[in-house]
Amino acid sequence: ACPKGASYEAGIVCRITKPALLVLNQETAKVVQTAFQRAGYPDVSGERAVMLLGRVKYGLHNLQISHLSIASSQVELVDAKTIDVAIQNVSVVFKGTLNYSYTSAWGLGINQSVDFEIDSAIDLQINTELTCDAGSVRTNAPDCYLAFHKLLLHLQGEREPGWLKQLFTNFISFTLKLILKRQVCNEINTISNIMADFVQTRAASILSDGDIGVDISVTGAPVITATYLESHHKGHFTHKNVSEAFPLRAFPPGLLGDSRMLYFWFSDQVLNSLARAAFQEGRLVLSLTGDEFKKVLETQGFDTNQEIFQELSRGLPTGQAQVAVHCLKVPKISCQNRGVVVSSSVAVTFRFPRPDGREAVAYRFEEDIITTVQASYSQKKLFLHLLDFQCVPASGRAGSSANLSVALRTEAKAVSNLTESRSESLQSSLRSLIATVGIPEVMSRLEVAFTALMNSKGLDLFEIINPEIITLDGCLLLQMDFGFPKHLLVDFLQSLS
């Protein structure tokens, strides 16, 4: 069981509003149809006393559905209680075999078997509670009602005597009502829990990649109001199933509205948790070949024949050069009203190997970089917008140097021919290069990488309408509308088969 209360501590919050439920309700019929078809209908046997015939033994066997259709359904949210679904005019045709036996007035034992169909019309009312157990959302439908508006028995060929049809119409009506209520309601409850697990597992999959996972266990029972339902999750990212848990913040419900279909709230602690996992995974690294670096520079309008580049390469062929950028420690992320602020310490290395392979020129320097970024999503792509940046030499850290480190490596010695003034000039030029070319290039590659990752998780299959990414102090908000996710329904129904 999970606690209930007025304070909701979480790293991630998901709010689904009434407009979203109305869209999702469009395909409720298919889920209910699956419940009817998956439900097992047991054989029933017994006996009854019939005037003039004595004891009549009977049995219903192989009861199954031959036709099923649903006219309409409605959904309502009952504040602090349940999700109520009303399904009208469920038309069901059952078929099966009726066995009966009795002793005739002449002392003969009569044992007959006849196929039958039952044509029925039913209304279904399901009131579902949301709870949680062991970090997962659970559903419970204590109120599940079936109302029969029609129940007609058709015996095979209608050749049997009228008393038989009358007798078994009454019996089958009573028996079928009991069986349907028990079996169908139980199956609906089972499918509801399977769906809850399916959604939570799919959400975790979207946020995971490789050895990076996420713990989206719920921190309390979901909240139901008259206009939305809401779940609260831990949001701890993991690396190789190991996470560094952080204290969860209290989520203020007033931050999210109910006019859009879907809302997400992310504490910036979650973003820091993701950055830590990515750093541990070794993903915060960028490597370019000389030709790739040259192409990047030319794309930004730089003349690679300038003196600075000749000084860098020292006349060595740039095609075999290597440029590497990597984070020295876990970046720090904070959400502010103006955007997402990322503080990172990076090392940049330029390496120019000589053709003989015996020596190479290498340049390395370290920078503390602070960027302020806003994000948007459109046309199934993520876009990052650089609002501001600062590049500061890493002179304040123990063991680091503000000066450019230059080395000419040979088999026997290491020498440097750069004068101090020339080194400072080159260093200044390289820092300018990082600011004007490096940061935009990294952001561009992040856009492509994040978009590819999201699409690999199937995000491009969703019809996301007018998404907004909003930053506030301490949190990131996503809000959007959407079309019915038919691919998810197909996947879910296939998982039931």
Curated annotation (Swiss-Prot):
Family: Belongs to the BPI/LBP/Plunc superfamily. BPI/LBP family.
Record-linked InterPro entries: Bactericidal_perm-incr_a/b_dom, Cholesteryl_ester_transfer, Lipid-bd_serum_glycop_C, Lipid-bd_serum_glycop_CS, Lipid-bd_serum_glycop_N
Keyword flag Signal: yes
Tissue expression summary: Expressed by the liver.
The keyword Disulfide bond appears for this protein: yes
Keywords from the UniProt entry: Cholesterol metabolism, Disulfide bond, Glycoprotein, Lipid metabolism, Lipid transport, Secreted, Signal, Steroid metabolism, Sterol metabolism, Transport
Function of the molecule: Involved in the transfer of neutral lipids, including cholesteryl ester and triglyceride, among lipoprotein particles. Allows the net movement of cholesteryl ester from high density lipoproteins/HDL to triglyceride-rich very low density lipoproteins/VLDL, and the equimolar transport of triglyceride from VLDL to HDL. Regulates the reverse cholesterol transport, by which excess cholesterol is removed from peripheral tissues and returned to the liver for elimination.
Residues carrying a glycan: 89, 99, 111, 241, 403, 417
Ranges in coiled-coil conformation: none
UniProt signal peptide: 1
Natural source organism: Oryctolagus cuniculus
A molecular function (GO) term: cholesterol binding
Single biological process term from Gene Ontology: low-density lipoprotein particle remodeling
Compartments, as annotated in UniProt: Secreted
Catalytic activity: cholesteryl (9Z-octadecenoate)(in) = cholesteryl (9Z-octadecenoate)(out); 1,2,3-tri-(9Z-octadecenoyl)-glycerol(in) = 1,2,3-tri-(9Z-octadecenoyl)-glycerol(out); cholesteryl (9Z,12Z)-octadecadienoate(in) = cholesteryl (9Z,12Z)-octadecadienoate(out)
PANTHER family cross-referenced by the UniProt entry: CHOLESTERYL ESTER TRANSFER PROTEIN (PTHR47616:SF1)
Main location class: secreted
GO CC terms of this entry: extracellular space; high-density lipoprotein particle
Protein name: Cholesteryl ester transfer protein
Cystine bridges: 144-185
Origin: domain of life: Eukaryota
